[in-house]
């Protein structure tokens, strides 16, 4: 009696089919990930390459703009030195660094031009070497000259206050520069007060000479 044919186990077949399908899905997914990673790396490479090209072009344009600006400033400086106006250049793109550099240079030039003068550079508010001679005033450059010129008149000798003004003028011209140098921060009125104090005690003061003569007698 022949053996009865036994068919394939249905459950085993289904399990193998599912396993094969899952493997196929996993393989397809893994392959897709590999391809995506490849194209992603390729995209990054392209982007980096494009960025480098863009940066290079940007630097080239900035260098060109700086060169144009430097040339314009050089021509402008040459024109100022020669005293000839130049034709204004067409406005060009200037970088922020160039603007800051130009402003910094202008501020330095302005600071140098506005540097405060020292007391030696500032002229006296009153020219002590040029005075208008008033009626009856004797012109003298030194105290000795003033006294010699005025002592020729016995009338004036009897009245030293009349030659006081000329003697004080000579005294002021001699001593004011020294007082001003010793006190550079004082105003002219303060300097004159110091000068007057010295004058009141000075032997060159005709009034002091009169007192000295009287005391000697």
UniProtKB/Swiss-Prot annotation:
<comment type="function">
    <text>Ribosome-binding protein involved in ribosome hibernation: associates with translationally inactive ribosomes and stabilizes the nonrotated conformation of the 80S ribosome, thereby promoting ribosome preservation and storage.</text>
</comment>
<dbReference type="GO" id="GO:0005813">
    <property type="term" value="C:centrosome"/>
</dbReference>
<dbReference type="InterPro" id="IPR010422">
    <property type="entry name" value="Ccdc124/Oxs1"/>
</dbReference>
<keyword id="KW-0175">Coiled coil</keyword>
<protein>
    <recommendedName>
        <fullName>Coiled-coil domain-containing protein 124</fullName>
    </recommendedName>
</protein>
<keyword id="KW-0963">Cytoplasm</keyword>
<keyword id="KW-0206">Cytoskeleton</keyword>
<dbReference type="InterPro" id="IPR036910">
    <property type="entry name" value="HMG_box_dom_sf"/>
</dbReference>
<comment type="similarity">
    <text>Belongs to the CCDC124 family.</text>
</comment>
<feature type="coiled-coil region">
    <location>
        <begin position="45"/>
        <end position="115"/>
    </location>
</feature>
<feature type="region of interest" description="Disordered">
    <location>
        <begin position="1"/>
        <end position="95"/>
    </location>
</feature>
<feature type="compositionally biased region" description="Basic and acidic residues">
    <location>
        <begin position="52"/>
        <end position="74"/>
    </location>
</feature>
<feature type="compositionally biased region" description="Basic and acidic residues">
    <location>
        <begin position="18"/>
        <end position="45"/>
    </location>
</feature>
<dbReference type="GO" id="GO:0030496">
    <property type="term" value="C:midbody"/>
</dbReference>
<dbReference type="InterPro" id="IPR054414">
    <property type="entry name" value="Ccdc124/Oxs1_C"/>
</dbReference>
<comment type="subunit">
    <text>Associates with translationally inactive ribosomes in the nonrotated state.</text>
</comment>
<dbReference type="GO" id="GO:0005737">
    <property type="term" value="C:cytoplasm"/>
</dbReference>
<dbReference type="Pfam" id="PF06244">
    <property type="entry name" value="Ccdc124"/>
</dbReference>
């Amino acid at each position: 009696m022949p053996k009865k044919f036994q068919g394939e186990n249905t459950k085993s077949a289904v399990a193998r089919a599912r396993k094969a399908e899952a493997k196929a899905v996993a393989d397809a997914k893994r392959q897709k990930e590999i391809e995506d990673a490849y194209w992603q790396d390729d995209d990054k490479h392209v982007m980096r390459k494009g960025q480098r090209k863009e940066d290079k072009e940007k630097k080239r344009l900035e260098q060109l703009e700086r060169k144009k600006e430097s040339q314009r400033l050089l021509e402008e400086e040459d024109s100022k030195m020669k005293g000839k106006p130049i034709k204004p250049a067409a406005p060009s793109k200037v970088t922020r660094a160039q603007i800051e550099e130009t402003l910094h240079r202008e501020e330095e030039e302005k600071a140098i031009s506005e540097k405060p003068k020292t007391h030696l550079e500032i002229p006296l508010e009153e020219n002590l070497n040029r005075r208008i001679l008033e009626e009856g005033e004797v012109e003298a450059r030194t105290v000795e000259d003033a006294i010699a010129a005025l002592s020729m008149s016995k009338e004036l000798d009897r009245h030293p206050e009349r030659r006081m003004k000329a003697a004080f003028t000579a005294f002021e011209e001699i001593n004011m520069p020294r007082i001003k140098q010793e006190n550079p921060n004082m105003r002219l009125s303060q300097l004159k007060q110091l000068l007057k104090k010295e004058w009141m005690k000075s032997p060159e003061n005709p009034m002091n000479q009169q007192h000295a003569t009287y005391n000697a007698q």
